[in-house]
Swiss-Prot record:
Protein's organism: Erythrobacter litoralis (strain HTCC2594)
Protein name: Tryptophan 2,3-dioxygenase
Gene Ontology biological process terms in this record: L-tryptophan catabolic process to acetyl-CoA; L-tryptophan catabolic process to kynurenine
Gene: kynA
Quaternary assembly: Homotetramer.
Lineage, broadest ranks: Bacteria, Pseudomonadati, Pseudomonadota, Alphaproteobacteria, Sphingomonadales
Keyword Metal-binding: yes
Length: 263
C-alpha cells in the first residue's frame, strides 16, 4: 500500500547504495565506480525518452517528442559534467585502480552503444563485443533492424512532401548513414522558411541539440582520458586518445550540420 512506501523503498536505495564494490583498496575507486554508475542511469533515462520520441516522430506526433528530446539534452549535460568530477582523479590515483579493471572499459557500455545505434551511428561490428551476454547482443541487433531516430525524421520529411530519394528511404538500416544532398536540400528549405515549417524546424534544432551535446560529451571523455592516462592504450584495447579523436569526427545528422553552410 502507498502509505507503506518510504523514500528508500521507492527508490530501492538499499540495492543501489550496495552496488559499489571497490577491489583495489584505493580511496579514489569509489569515485570511479559512482561516476560510471551514475552515467549509466542517465543513459537509461536518455534511452527511455529517445525510444518514445522515435515513436512520436514515426506517428507524426511531434509536440510530445520535443519535450522528450529536450529532456535528453538536459540529461546529456549531466553526463558532460560527470567528466569534471572524474577529472579530479590524478594519474597516480588511476594507476592504483587500473590493474584491477582487466579489459573492462566504458567502450563496452551496452547502453552507450544502444544510444549510438538509436541516433543513427550504426556499425554492426560493435555488437561482437557483447556476444558473451546474449540478451544484450540480441537487443542491439534488434535495434539495428529498426529505423533510427534520424531515419524516422527523414521519413517524416518524405511524408510531408519533401523530395527524399527512394534509395535513402529504402537504405539498409544497419549501415552508417551516408550524407545525401537531397536530404540537405530538404532541410535547407525548412531552414529558409521556418514559419512555414515550424514543427519540422523545431525538430531539426532538437536533433542538433542532441548532436551538439553528444559531441561535447565525447570531447570531455577525450580530454579526461588525456589528462589521466595520457596516450596509453585504453583498457578495452582501443588506441585511447587517438581513437577518441577519430570518434569526434563522426556525426549522427550530417545534413543538419552541412545545411548551415548551404543557407
Amino acid at each position: 500500500m502507498a502509505q507503506d512506501v518510504t523514500y528508500s523503498s521507492y527508490l530501492d536505495l538499499d540495492r543501489i547504495l550496495a552496488a559499489q564494490h571497490p577491489v583495489s583498496g584505493a580511496h579514489d575507486e569509489m569515485l570511479f565506480i559512482i561516476v560510471h554508475q551514475a552515467s549509466e542511469l542517465w543513459l537509461k533515462l536518455c534511452l527511455h525518452e529517445l525510444f518514445a520520441a522515435r515513436d512520436c516522430i514515426a506517428a507524426d506526433n511531434l509536440r510530445p517528442s520535443f519535450k522528450m528530446l529536450s529532456r535528453v539534452a538536459r540529461a546529456q549535460t549531466q553526463l558532460i559534467q560527470s567528466w569534471d568530477v572524474l577529472s579530479t582523479m590524478t594519474p597516480h590515483d588511476y594507476s592504483q585502480i587500473r590493474p584491477h579493471l582487466g579489459r573492462s572499459s566504458g567502450f563496452q557500455s551496452p547502453q552507450y552503444r544502444m544510444m549510438e545505434f538509436l541516433l543513427g551511428g550504426r556499425n554492426p561490428d560493435m555488437v561482437a563485443m557483447h556476444e558473451p551476454t546474449p540478451e544484450i547482443a540480441t537487443a542491439l541487433r534488434e535495434e539495428l533492424a529498426r529505423t533510427s531516430l534520424y531515419d524516422e525524421a527523414i521519413r517524416l520529411l518524405s511524408r510531408r512532401g519533401f523530395a527524399i530519394p527512394d534509395e535513402v528511404l529504402a537504405r539498409k538500416l544497419d549501415e552508417v548513414w551516408v550524407r545525401s544532398e537531397e536530404v540537405e536540400a530538404a532541410w535547407a528549405e525548412i531552414y529558409r522558411d521556418p514559419q512555414q515549417h515550424w514543427d519540422l524546424y523545431e525538430l531539426a534544432e532538437k536533433l542538433v541539440d542532441l548532436e551538439y551535446h553528444f559531441q561535447r560529451w565525447r570531447f570531455g571523455h577525450l580530454k579526461t582520458v588525456e589528462r589521466i592516462i595520457g596516450f596509453k592504450r585504453g583498457t578495452g584495447g582501443t588506441k585511447g586518445v587517438p581513437y577518441l579523436e577519430g570518434v569526434l569526427k563522426q556525426a549522427f545528422f550530417p545534413e543538419l550540420l552541412s545545411v548551415r553552410t548551404a543557407i
